[in-house]
């Protein structure tokens, strides 16, 4: 009798195989969610580091070009062709990079006091460039902490 009950209620091999596939599907659906959250977090971290490094590099590059090509010929600092080309390149490389050549590129003295463009002297004065770029995470959990604006200032002496 006992063997008869085992034989009658033994699941068929096809049923066992379907049950295993269903179990794998449930396990996959439970494991994919934390994996995707971690993956998106790593992508957000990479985007944040890229934006932060990009703003820093953009400020330095614009400053380097501006100290070599100081004015546009009419005495306006930061409006030379080379500087405007560099600004356009950096704006294309860093998403959302903001720089206003009129207010963000200034001539300063050794105490960081602003000097008028016409009074800017090579050898003793400096060029200061300030740039900023907004960053908003795309991962919902990370975006709960809000967005951030990366800012960078570079200062180099005019040769």
Task: Report residues per predicted region.
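Alpha-helical assembly-interface signal, strongest on the long, hydrophobic N-terminal helix that forms
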Residues: 2-88
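Selective for proline/serine-rich intrinsically disordered segments
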Residues: 11, 32, 93, 132-138
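Short amphipathic secondary-structure patches
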Residues: 2, 57, 61-130
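Low-complexity, S/T/G/P-rich flexible repeat/linker segments used as non-globular hinges
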Residues: 2-6, 132-159
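Extreme N-terminus of proteins, especially the signal/transit-peptide cleavage junction
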Residues: 17-20, 122, 145-147
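A short, hydrophobic/aromatic-rich structural module that often spans a beta strand
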Residues: 11, 112-124, 148-159
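Intrinsically disordered, low-complexity segments enriched in proline/serine/threonine
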Residues: 13, 97, 139-142
């Amino acid at each position: 009798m006992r063997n008869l009950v085992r034989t009658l209620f033994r699941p068929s091999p096809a049923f066992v195989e379907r049950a295993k596939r269903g179990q794998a599907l449930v396990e996959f659906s439970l494991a994919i969610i934390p994996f995707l959250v971690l993956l998106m977090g790593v992508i957000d971290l990479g985007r944040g580091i890229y934006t932060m490094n990009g703003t820093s590099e953009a400020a330095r590059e614009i400053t380097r070009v501006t100290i070599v090509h100081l004015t546009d010929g009419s005495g306006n600092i930061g409006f030379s062709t080379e500087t405007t080309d560099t600004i356009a390149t950096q704006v294309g490389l860093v998403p959302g990079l903001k720089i206003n050549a009129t207010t963000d590129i200034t001539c300063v003295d050794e105490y960081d006091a602003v000097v008028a463009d016409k009074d800017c002297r090579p050898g003793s004065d400096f060029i200061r460039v300030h740039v900023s770029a907004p960053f908003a995470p795309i991962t919902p959990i990370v975006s709960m902490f809000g967005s951030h604006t990366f800012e960078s200032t570079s200062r180099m002496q005019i040769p």
